[in-house]
């Protein structure tokens, strides 16, 4: 099949790589324009562009898709069979979606219609979902509303964070794309509609995965410990608090149950403080912080100006005292 690939972040690279190594032909790659991503205002190409250029694939980075007749004419000249779209970063207008002979197809990182939208991986962890997955859908004008051709679910492990789950779903996307394209190719002279499942028939509750904003990255210690744990994993490694007026990124924590506190003879004073306070200091083990429910043990964090540090080193860097407050 003759394919034009649309994608931007690292998540998309695995699928492009797999397609490049397959029997299918990648005619061109469409990705977001280079952006200033580091100090010195240096322009950095997207991960997809970097891979495509390394492989000698034609790359296009349109600033806009609306009222861009020249670019639309260019797409039509390729006479491609499919558009494959994975985390491109912009909504494709219908007049672009309808260009390929066998339409445009998207790999979406959720079990649709649950978590339509921009941040499905983050929200599946934030909400404590037991399972997630990938669906390959035929694209239409609506936001992730298309009919599903193939899908597969995987379990979200308790220790999964944004990095680990993104890797699993990126790999799964590449696997399912090949299956989906094979089905499309096998039925290219037939009506494929009988192979598609409408999202309303998938018996899942519709939920939207809104974009993550700056305030989402701040820990509210008045939340319960489970919600704090999920936030740290879902938005890894960018969740933060403050301590002694310095920014502290929380990388990893452990929820301490009552039994564990008693069995390990941890001495804490949780009954004296509201959420967000240092309520225990364990030699060589770290800092215990109060929440709305169970206390948490700080395992890994990054103090501004420092590298990621573990428990003993954090004790030295922060020099905390019982009763000192986080997010001061």
Curated annotation (Swiss-Prot):
SUPFAM superfamilies: FMT C-terminal domain-like, Formyltransferase. (6S)-5,6,7,8-tetrahydrofolate binds at residues 110-113. InterPro entries: Fmt, Formyl_trans_C, Formyl_transf_N, Formyl_transf_N_sf, Formyl_transferase-like_C_sf, Met-tRNA-FMT_N. It comes from the Bacteria. It catalyses: L-methionyl-tRNA(fMet) + (6R)-10-formyltetrahydrofolate = N-formyl-L-methionyl-tRNA(fMet) + (6S)-5,6,7,8-tetrahydrofolate + H(+). Keywords: Protein biosynthesis, Transferase. One of its GO terms (molecular function) is methionyl-tRNA formyltransferase activity. Its EC number is 2.1.2.9. GO terms for cellular component: cytosol. The keyword Membrane does not apply. Belongs to the Fmt family. PANTHER family: METHIONYL-TRNA FORMYLTRANSFERASE, METHIONYL-TRNA FORMYLTRANSFERASE, MITOCHONDRIAL. Attaches a formyl group to the free amino group of methionyl-tRNA(fMet). The formyl group appears to play a dual role in the initiator identity of N-formylmethionyl-tRNA by promoting its recognition by IF2 and preventing the misappropriation of this tRNA by the elongation apparatus. HAMAP family: Formyl_trans (MF_00182). This is Methionyl-tRNA formyltransferase. The gene is fmt.
């Amino acid at each position: 099949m003759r394919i034009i690939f649309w994608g931007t972040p690292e998540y998309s690279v695995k699928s492009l790589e797999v397609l490049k190594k397959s029997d299918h032909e990648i005619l061109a790659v469409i990705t977001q324009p280079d952006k200033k991503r580091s100090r010195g205002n240096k322009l950095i190409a997207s991960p997809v562009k970097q891979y495509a250029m390394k492989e000698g694939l034609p790359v296009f980075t349109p600033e806009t898709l609306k009222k861009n007749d020249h670019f639309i004419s260019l797409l039509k000249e390729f006479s491609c069979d499919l558009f494959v779209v994975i985390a491109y970063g912009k909504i494709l207008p219908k007049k672009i979606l309808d260009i390929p002979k066998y339409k445009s197809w998207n790999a979406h990182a959720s079990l649709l219609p649950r978590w339509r939208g921009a941040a499905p991986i983050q929200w599946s962890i934030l909400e404590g979902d037991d399972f997630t997955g990938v669906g390959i859908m035929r694209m239409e004008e609506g936001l992730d509303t298309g009919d599903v051709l193939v899908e597969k679910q995987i379990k979200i492990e308790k220790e999964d964070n944004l990095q680990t789950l993104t890797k699993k779903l990126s790999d799964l996307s590449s696997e399912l794309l090949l299956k989906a394209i094979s089905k499309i190719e096998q039925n290219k002279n037939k009506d494929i509609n009988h192979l598609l499942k409408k999202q309303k028939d998938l018996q899942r509750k519709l939920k939207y995965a809104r974009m993550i904003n700056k305030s989402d990255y701040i820990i509210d210690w008045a939340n319960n410990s489970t919600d704090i744990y999920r936030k740290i994993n879902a938005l890894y490694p960018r969740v933060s608090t403050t301590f002694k007026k310095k920014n502290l990124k929380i990388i990893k924590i452990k929820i301490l149950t009552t039994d564990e506190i008693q069995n390990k003879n941890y001495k804490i004073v949780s009954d004296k403080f509201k959420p967000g306070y240092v309520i225990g200091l364990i030699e060589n083990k770290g800092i215990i912080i109060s929440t709305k429910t169970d206390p948490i043990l700080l395992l890994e964090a990054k103090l501004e100006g420092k590298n990621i540090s573990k428990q003993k080193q954090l004790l030295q860097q922060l020099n905390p005292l019982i009763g000192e407050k986080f997010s001061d």
